[in-house]
Structure formats: structure tokens, C-alpha cells
Amino acid sequence: MRLRTIPVLLLVLAASNGLRAQSPDEQFRRANQLYQQGKFAEARDAYGAILAGGYESPDLFYNLGNACYKSGSIPGAILNYERARRLLPGDDDLRHNLQVANMMITDRIEPTPRLFVWDYWDAIKNFLSLSGLTLVAYLFYALVAVAIAVFFLARTYALRKVALLAGSGFLLIFFFLLTVLIARLGDATRTDEAVVMSPIVTVKNSPDPKSSDAFVLHAGVKVQLVDRVGIWSKVRLADGKVGWLEGSSVEVI
């Protein structure tokens, strides 16, 4: 449960709505009160109303996930925990809650093994929040600028050499941080993942209701969206299985 006011990350309201800028914080506090009073379904609806107004933040997704879990909507909990994790991938409480919610679903899907190097890459990407990563990148950008200034203003060869070496190191670190930041932004804005929201879904071998059945999924399973034909979405599971289901049975993370 996150009780602090909403740190809004995305606001998709027109400028003319500026006079109502405080209302999301008030709604957030009200939703928190409902949650603390044990009115979980009402709290879930209150958090959802804030999202419907165009506001997003990791705390909002996290609290909505908690309210969904407490009100018995496990798929909704997983969906919102996953959305929060994109913005706060290193949060231990969030990771724990998502694991608990995933233990409540019917399907157990074991992911295919991957190279250990990708685990290290994920750890590096998720070490800092987006804002923290951006701040550190700006810091090294400033250090590069300082090193360049020192190089051109220095009166001795030794000082110029130090500035050149330091600036080169700072520049390499800056480009590395920029690469990590771009990757994190890509993770946060991707639209190719979804959660099954329908209780039971029969996945087909082709985008046709008369096609043969491939397998069955239950609510709460996370899938990757790889293609779309009309109302049908082609999905891939973590274990590599592929099939087609109606797009209305899933919700994009």
C-alpha cells in the first residue's frame, strides 16, 4: 500500500483542465482511505477512475493491484502489478506481490531457459528508477562538458592529459547510461505484452473460430502479442507455445 500522493508520470489531459490539477491527489487519498477501511472493491473503482482520467504512476498501479487482489480480481492484480513493474522494476514489495498473485492462477508456465548474460543486463537496467537513471546520465554529461572545458582552458600538458583521459572515461560511461536509459524507456512503453482477463480461453491454431484447438489458458496468464488479424491476436507464452485468441480476452499491459 503506497499512501503518498500521486507522482504523476503521464498526463493526457488538455491544457484547459489545468484548474483541476489537484483533483487526482484528492481522489488518490480518498481511494487510500477506502482501502484502509477494508472497502476494497470501492477502492479498486476509485483508483480505476483516476486511471480513466489519464493519470498514471507506479504507486497508482501498485495500489490498484493491491485493491484488485483484496477484492478477488487476481487477473486485475497481475495486470496492474505488471504495469507498475515497468516503472519500478527493482521494487522488492512489488516483486513479492506479483509472485504471490501469480501463485493464485491456474496455469503454471515455465519460461524457456535463456543466457545468463540477459539476467545481468536486466539487473543493470533495473538497478535505478527511470528518474534516477536520467539524473545520473545528466551528471556524467555535465562531467564530460567540464572535462572538455578544462582540456581547452588548461595551460599545462599534464592537466590537459588528465582532462582528456577523464573526459574519455566520462563519455564512455555516459553512452553506456544512455543505452541503458533507452532500453528502460523501451521496456516502459512496450505494447506487445498482455494479461488474459477472461476466465477460460481456448487458443486456436489459426485466426478462425473453426480452427483446431491449440491449448487452453486461464485468467491471469501473461502473454506476448506477436501478430493481429481482425479480432484475433497471435500470442506466445513464456514456454514458447504459440496460438491465436480473440483480442477481447486479453488486456495490454
Regions found by a protein language model. Name each.
Residues 36, 190, 196-225, 229-230, ...:
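Beta-loop motif signature
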Residues 74, 164-198, 206-208, 236-253:
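Boundary regions of SH3-family modules and the immediately adjacent low-complexity/disordered segments
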Residues 113-153:
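Membrane-embedded alpha-helical segments of integral membrane proteins
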